[in-house]
């Protein structure tokens, strides 16, 4: 996510050629956030994944499987998580060419899209990463309250 000019912790993601931060989330099948982390964009995906997987494991000790994309299949992360936490990481693979909706992966992308509807979350305006995480929590709370009031 691009950051504003207000300063704060940010990094350069060479893969996306973006200066900003990375957001990591673990969601359930309804798209509700169990854990989230915001890191500078130059940190590796494995570092952010470890943060959110540990936080999720503390809350849901009966968790058996986490679905992830291929970025999290590097440096032995799935093996490490399986051995230390007893959680299986299944890598959802993309097809070689074209577009295909990947059902498990789509839940995460849909949640990010819902969060980006908030003006404060469409771009990272916060100076500190803990403030950015708090704004994501507030966005999730707003979304859950909107669901409750509709029914």
Question: Where are the regions a protein language model picked out?
Answer:
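Polybasic low-complexity intrinsically disordered regions
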Residues: 1-86, 93, 139
């Amino acid at each position: 996510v691009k950051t504003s000019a207000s300063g704060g912790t940010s990094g350069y993601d060479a893969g996306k050629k973006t200066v900003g931060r990375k957001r990591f989330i673990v969601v359930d099948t309804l798209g509700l956030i169990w854990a989230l982390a915001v890191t500078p964009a130059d940190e590796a995906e494995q570092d952010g994944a470890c943060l959110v997987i540990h936080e999720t494991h503390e809350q849901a000790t009966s968790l058996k499987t986490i679905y992830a994309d291929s970025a999290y299949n590097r440096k032995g992360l799935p093996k490490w998580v399986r051995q230390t936490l007893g959680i299986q990481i299944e890598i959802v693979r993309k097809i070689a060419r074209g577009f295909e909706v990947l059902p498990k992966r789509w839940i995460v992308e849909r949640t990010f899209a819902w969060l980006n509807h908030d003006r404060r979350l469409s771009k990272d305006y916060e100076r500190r990463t803990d403030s950015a995480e708090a704004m994501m929590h507030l966005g999730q709370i707003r979304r859950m309250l909107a669901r409750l009031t509709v029914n």
